[in-house]
From Swiss-Prot:
Pfam families on file: RNA_pol_Rbc25, SHS2_Rpb7-N
Name this polypeptide is given: DNA-directed RNA polymerase III subunit RPC8
Role summary: DNA-dependent RNA polymerase catalyzes the transcription of DNA into RNA using the four ribonucleoside triphosphates as substrates. Specific peripheric component of RNA polymerase III (Pol III) which synthesizes small non-coding RNAs including 5S rRNA, snRNAs, tRNAs and miRNAs from at least 500 distinct genomic loci. With CRCP/RPC9 forms a mobile stalk that protrudes from Pol III core and functions primarily in transcription initiation. Pol III plays a key role in sensing and limiting infection by intracellular bacteria and DNA viruses.
Gene3D superfamilies on file: Nucleic acid-binding proteins, RNA polymerase Rpb7-like, N-terminal domain
GO CC annotations, alphabetized: centrosome; nucleoplasm; RNA polymerase III complex
Subunit architecture: Component of the RNA polymerase III complex consisting of 17 subunits: a ten-subunit horseshoe-shaped catalytic core composed of POLR3A/RPC1, POLR3B/RPC2, POLR1C/RPAC1, POLR1D/RPAC2, POLR3K/RPC10, POLR2E/RPABC1, POLR2F/RPABC2, POLR2H/RPABC3, POLR2K/RPABC4 and POLR2L/RPABC5; a mobile stalk composed of two subunits POLR3H/RPC8 and CRCP/RPC9, protruding from the core and functioning primarily in transcription initiation; and additional subunits homologous to general transcription factors of the RNA polymerase II machinery, POLR3C/RPC3-POLR3F/RPC6-POLR3G/RPC7 heterotrimer required for transcription initiation and POLR3D/RPC4-POLR3E/RPC5 heterodimer involved in both transcription initiation and termination.
Keyword vocabulary terms for this entry: Antiviral defense, DNA-directed RNA polymerase, Immunity, Innate immunity, Nucleus, Transcription
Compartment list: Nucleus
Segments forming a coiled coil: none
Amino acid sequence: MFVLVEMVDTVRIPPWQFERKLNDSIAEELNKKLANKVVYNVGLCICLFDITKLEDAYVFPGDGASHTKVHFRYVVFHPFLDEILIGKIKGCSPEGVHVSLGFFDDILIPPESLQQPAKFDEAEQVWVWEYETEEGAHDLYMDTGEEIRFRVVDESFVDTSPTGPSSAEAASSSEELPKKEAPYTLVGSISEPGLGLLSWWTSN
């Protein structure tokens, strides 16, 4: 679920931090820049693990700050495909079941990846597994807040870097706001034995 990623970046340290240890100042600046941010095709950055190399620092004309090229390792949330995770149901919609890990919310289990047969209860706004028994179908509700075990089957990165508006977008900008896309999304599945709500598989 978590991986160590080697990165390189140039860190700017302002003059008023020169009295501090260089490593402490660099660690603080790196965490300010990266913590809780999604790096495209890398994952969600959590925290600095260690600094492996510091190159020479430079002070440029007109800027009293030091600029240091830093090699470091960062803890990143990036689950492997087919990895099993446990989260909590954040909510349900016709699109599927939305799951949260607490620190990461952009997880969707689409209808075709639920235990089958499944239906969406419009009145309750929940997905229901119509579990077949000898006595007939038994409805198992996927309620908000329930713990759920799922398999990661796909991931999607979206480049959300700021770009200038096109002429078509500029014309329609006053009419409607564009839908904000998540920079990193996971797609899950519970369509196999042992997956789904933990309460479904708890032995008495």
